Amino acid sequence: MKVTDQRYRLGYHLMTKGGWMNDPNGFSWFKGYYHMFYQYYPYAAEWGPMHWGHARSKDLVHWETLPVALAPDEHEDGCFSGSAVVYDGKLWLIYTGHHLTNPADSEEFYQDQNIAWSEDGIAFHKYEGNPVLRAPKGNTKHFRDPKVWQEGDTFYMVLGSQGSDELGRALLYKSPNLKQWEPVSVLDKAVSLKAEGYMWECPDFFRLDGRDILLMSPQGLEPQGDCFHNLNQTGYLLGRQDEDGRLQRKDFTEIDRGHDFYATQTLLAPDGRRLMTAWMNAWDSPMQEKEDGWAGALTIPRELRVEKGRLYQQPVREMASVRSGKLLDGKLAAGSRTALPSTSEAQLTFKEAWNYQGTLLKLGDGQQELTLSFDPKGSRLILCRSTKDGERAAQILPFEELSLQIFVDRSSAEIFVNEGEITFTERMYWQGALSLELRDIPAEKAVIYALEAETNRY
């Protein structure tokens, strides 16, 4: 699929050279490169039979697109989401095979788990003994998105599932060799349809800072106050796994409070960091770039940590390498307006925000705007964009200073609040020159960088 217009193409986010992209898959480290795979349909800017696109990077920022890693064949109608592990000197992909039982009805299907391997991390071979895992009894047709990791000599898999009670759940399996799998437990399941949904997609289970964390994307949650206003959500359960393999945990918490964030995938990097990326769209996103022959992108990689009982996320330190020039290092006055390059980073610190009520800043081109406001009565940060269903809000912990780190990339904005306590991820289809406008309180510290305008190599 050929891109016909560059107007919305991103500068420093991973994209395809054309066609459709959704979930990140197989985030891994192999033979000196970070590898990122993703759900991909190369023949149209619409969802279609799923392939695995593939890119690699030395630094998490500059990506080289590689040949398609997996494609549908006579055995499966789609290669759905999954993960990657290094084993026996090879890079192994673990993915969901999607099988249509009635080509005339996309809702008639079954799913199973499969593996493929590569010696060089580029050319992959599907295992002749696929599938390696079929859905258990007491499960519906929803059985997908395996995330695999290794502990000692044992591989573990967490898998998204729907039980016969039509509630979402995460299943845990183990294997000595990626080929023979046996069940360990139902790691966790939804407490109710309304609160935690009918299906848990893209689960990811790991220990971080002494806590066990289950990331997933539940479907079917109903809005509750400021929470759960996207079509589908992404968030986490934080707790501890017990001796029976079950997660004893707190309530589900959204991990990003913007409109355009779904289907996370993490990697335990060689240096010990837990890194995460996600699809920087959602199934109800407008995706205006489809008019130009492409759709979808991934967020900038983020480093995770647990702090104050929450999962925090910040841009990986490698993002500093895309700074091409410092445009401002000082203060910004109340009421000021500052021009921003279409690929830029702004770091702002407000010292008077806790007692302020109203709009803090506006970011936009005069037609499409993002505004960020604060409500001290509810300790709420409120983000509004000039579209239908434009408001999203999150409660913030008490602070002395409010710090914002804002990444702008032509048709996207990612906002990190107070060192990653809250994030908002947005696709914004700006047409004109961008500016950052402060309202009634100044930024006591302001640093603005221009960022590289092209980090993808196709």
Region annotations inferred by a language model:
Residues 232-458:
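Beta-rich accessory regions
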